[in-house]
């Protein structure tokens, strides 16, 4: 990525220390750049020029089925979403520019969606992005004084990238009829292959989405001194990695 930083690829350029594009028509020629610009911005830590952001917002209608199913674009988005450096700032910017919901149409349904429950202080889209940010805060030891166990545990996770995809998808079925966890698990099975994930990772992500409320429901609704409750929970989880 240092090479990217030194040699910003065309049609991008640096304008007043910010990533820019000279004409919005250039997005019409290569719509892939509507995703690529966020990728470059994230991995070079160069902010996108406000004028270019307006161009992007004006051009989101170019994000059509052909771009959504483009292998290269999906690889770019996957690398951004699962970056070892917290991508939440970039994802939030993509969301504000209406790029995120256009590229992941299933996500568009939760943009601005309000939930009246104990888990959501924010709209579902913002809650999702905060969740991703918090995972990185845990990983980087921000909460170590509060819970050193969480920091130690997350550093042992082998499937960190699938975890980040699951974080992005965990509430994607909110606002739909039925159980949002079960519906979300089915949506995950459709989105994951699009992001070039293999069958094992797809199954893991779908399982995480399906069971993302298991621990909180068990902790808040059942007697944790009852061995049967703990055994039942353990039977669902099956492994330390999934836990």
Description of each model-found segment:
Residues 1-120, 189:
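Non-catalytic interface/linker regions that flank or bridge core catalytic/transmembrane domains
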Residues 2-5, 143-153:
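Conserved alpha/beta core surface patches that mediate binding of polyanionic ligands
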Residues 43-51, 62-65, 83-90, 99-104, ...:
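Intrinsically disordered or highly flexible coil/loop and linker segments, enriched in small
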Residues 109-110, 142-146, 186, 225:
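A short linear-motif detector with a strong N-terminal bias
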Residues 114, 123-124, 150-243:
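Divalent metal-dependent catalytic cores for phosphoryl transfer on phosphate-bearing substrates
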Residues 127:
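Short beta-strand-centered segments that line the small-molecule binding cleft or hinge
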Residues 134:
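Phosphate-handling DNA/RNA-contact segment within nucleic-acid enzymes
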């Amino acid at each position: 990525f240092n090479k990217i930083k030194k040699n910003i690829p065309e049609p991008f350029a640096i304008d007043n220390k910010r990533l820019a594009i000279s004409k919005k028509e250039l997005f019409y020629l290569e719509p892939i750049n509507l995703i690529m610009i966020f990728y470059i911005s994230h991995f070079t830590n160069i902010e996108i020029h406000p004028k270019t952001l307006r161009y992007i917002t004006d051009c989101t209608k170019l994000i059509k089925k052909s771009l959504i199913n483009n292998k290269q674009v999906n690889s770019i988005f996957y690398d951004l979403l699962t970056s070892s450096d917290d991508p939440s700032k970039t994802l939030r910017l993509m969301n504000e520019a209406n790029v995120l919901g256009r590229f992941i149409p299933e996500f568009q349904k939760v943009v601005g969606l309000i939930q009246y429950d104990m888990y959501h202080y924010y709209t579902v889209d913002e809650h999702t992005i905060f969740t991703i940010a918090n995972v990185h805060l845990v990983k980087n030891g921000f909460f170590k004084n509060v819970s050193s166990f969480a920091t130690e545990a997350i550093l042992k996770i082998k499937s960190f990238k699938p975890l980040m995809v699951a974080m992005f998808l965990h509430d994607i079925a909110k606002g739909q009829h039925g159980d949002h966890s079960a519906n979300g698990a089915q949506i995950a099975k459709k989105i994951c292959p699009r992001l070039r994930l293999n069958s094992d990772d797809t199954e893991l992500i779908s399982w995480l989405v399906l069971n993302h409320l298991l621990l909180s429901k068990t902790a808040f609704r059942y007697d944790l001194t009852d061995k049967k409750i703990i055994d039942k929970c353990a039977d669902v989880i099956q492994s330390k990695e999934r836990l």
